[in-house]
Amino acid sequence: MIRIAIDAMGGDFGPEPIIAGVVEALKDTKFSAVLVGDSNAIKPLIPEMYLKNIAFLEAAEVISMAEGATDALKRKESSIYKAIELLKNKEVDAVVSAGHSGATMSLATLRVGRLKNVARPAIATLMPNSKESTTLVLDVGANVDCRSEHLFQFAVMGEAYAKEILNRKLPRVGLLSNGEEACKGNEVSKEAFELVSRLDSFVGNAEGNQVFDGSVDVIVCDGFIGNILLKTSEGVADAIGKIIKKQVKKSPLAIAGSVLMKKVFRTLKKQVSYDEYGGAPLLGINGCVIISHGKSNSKAIKNAIFQAINFANSNINKVIEEELSHFAR
């Protein structure tokens, strides 16, 4: 049975939505959970019937969002440190955390270690597109500054994830740039273009709109651009939702029409909501770590756990190592 460590104290809203998500996941599938945190705060939130599938690991500290990522390495009593140590010692198959993403990434990289031939791990996230599907984008925050070889490795890892986890038989990989032509981009992206061209899956440069039109399956960029893209997309989706609500309320006819469109709005909300996707895997480490949104609700945590189970049941890390070995110097 898959065993997952969950940082029960991470996230913006405390343990309540995290524990609720764990319970919802246990209702739907079989796995063993290790909840890391303050057991006195956690246990009262769990129905007794689920306790047989849950173990507890006491952690006295929590890494706050205001702290630096490197500070986490010194905080050995923190919930995320202890969760990562379980993965390092192979006592669990995966870690899920909605806490400090920088701390989670630093600990996973330095304590669990990287896969062979991976210079830097990357955070990969799914974004909705107009084809009623998703586009995998990486990196979305792990690496602010990248060299061309890092972007090439992201492309290999993204392609492998698309095949193994998303079941895309022939994924199309694009390099995010300011134009489709090979001559577009900065010096790093131009160098990366030459490297990524070695992949049969590479379809060339991709512009920002292609993240959402379904023309590519994997978008590669550095973490600085990727994080801005992610946060901007979240902001636009939220703003459009609010604009629609305000406009509907201004007209009785629009209100009547919105009732008829309720199913459409529900489907749209489901497609663009982050909680449908759960979290973002940290690709390139010697294990499975899912980084969830700090504002994760119970549904997001549940789906992050499902993500972790799928990852742990796959051969994705082996595939990444094998693919990168073909290009090792």
From Swiss-Prot:
Alphabetized PANTHER family for the sequence: FATTY ACID/PHOSPHOLIPID SYNTHESIS PROTEIN PLSX, PHOSPHATE ACYLTRANSFERASE
Catalytic activity: a fatty acyl-[ACP] + phosphate = an acyl phosphate + holo-[ACP]
Keywords: Cytoplasm, Lipid biosynthesis, Lipid metabolism, Phospholipid biosynthesis, Phospholipid metabolism, Transferase
Entry's EC annotation: 2.3.1.274
Pathway: Lipid metabolism; phospholipid metabolism
Functional summary from the UniProt entry: Catalyzes the reversible formation of acyl-phosphate (acyl-PO(4)) from acyl-[acyl-carrier-protein] (acyl-ACP). This enzyme utilizes acyl-ACP as fatty acyl donor, but not acyl-CoA.
HAMAP family for this protein: PlsX
Provenance organism: Campylobacter curvus (strain 525.92)
Subunit structure: Homodimer. Probably interacts with PlsY.
InterPro entries linked to this entry: FA_synthesis, Phospholipid_synth_PlsX-like
UniProt entry tagged with the keyword Transferase: yes
Any one biological process term the GO annotation gives: fatty acid biosynthetic process
Record-stated family: Belongs to the PlsX family.
Designated name of the protein: Phosphate acyltransferase
Coiled coil start-end: none
Tagged with keyword Lipid metabolism: yes
Taxon lineage: Bacteria, Pseudomonadati, Campylobacterota, Epsilonproteobacteria, Campylobacterales
Pfam families reported in the protein's UniProt record: FA_synthesis (PF02504)
